């Protein structure tokens, strides 16, 4: 049985790559953000152990980045189908959605990690820096949210 030109046998491959890219790159960003800000918390908590729970916010925000990638990966994986029912166009759209959320999650995770590390160390020395750190972390988190919005918009095409 010959497949139509718009539904080649390799069409679903691009959808699978989109799902993989979504979770892999966003999880890499979340892992980096968690590790980088976690080391800052560990270094700060030696001198100021009472600030540990207050300083956990960057770690939580980094973990949310991975959830963005997970949502898109599950959406894409749920719509995968046999090559006869899955067009090349849909595969490319899903690849683009996965790359959008994945790379924006990677960038957001890097930003959260660097800001979180410096922020918790600075907050230990000057508590008034806490509000500024939170605001910068929110701006870094929104970078990942932009990727999620674009990915969901692409997915619905």
UniProtKB/Swiss-Prot annotation:
Annotated site (Essential for proton translocation): 141
Cytoplasmic topological intervals: 34-55, 117-128
Keywords, comma-separated and alphabetical: Hydrogen ion transport, Ion transport, Membrane, Transmembrane, Transmembrane helix, Transport
Name of the protein: V-type proton ATPase 16 kDa proteolipid subunit c
Gene3D superfamilies per record: lithium bound rotor ring of v- atpase
Statement: the UniProt record of this protein carries the keyword Ion transport: yes
Assembly information from the UniProt record: V-ATPase is a heteromultimeric enzyme made up of two complexes: the ATP-hydrolytic V1 complex and the proton translocation V0 complex. The V1 complex consists of three catalytic AB heterodimers that form a heterohexamer, three peripheral stalks each consisting of EG heterodimers, one central rotor including subunits D and F, and the regulatory subunits C and H. The proton translocation complex V0 consists of the proton transport subunit a, a ring of proteolipid subunits c9c'', rotary subunit d, subunits e and f, and the accessory subunits VhaAC45 and ATP6AP2.
Top-level division of the source organism's lineage: Eukaryota
Residues in the Lumenal compartment per record: 1-10, 77-94, 155-157
Entry's localization field: Membrane
Function: Proton-conducting pore forming subunit of the V0 complex of vacuolar(H+)-ATPase (V-ATPase), a multisubunit enzyme composed of a peripheral complex (V1) that hydrolyzes ATP and a membrane integral complex (V0) that translocates protons. V-ATPase is responsible for acidifying and maintaining the pH of intracellular compartments and in some cell types, is targeted to the plasma membrane, where it is responsible for acidifying the extracellular environment.
Membrane topology: Multi-pass membrane protein
Positions of transmembrane segments: 11-33, 56-76, 95-116, 129-154
GO CC aspect terms: proton-transporting V-type ATPase, V0 domain
A Pfam family assignment: ATP-synt_C
Gene source species: Aedes aegypti (Yellowfever mosquito)
Protein family membership: Belongs to the V-ATPase proteolipid subunit family.
Keyword Transmembrane: yes
GO molecular-function term, one example from the UniProt record: proton-transporting ATPase activity, rotational mechanism
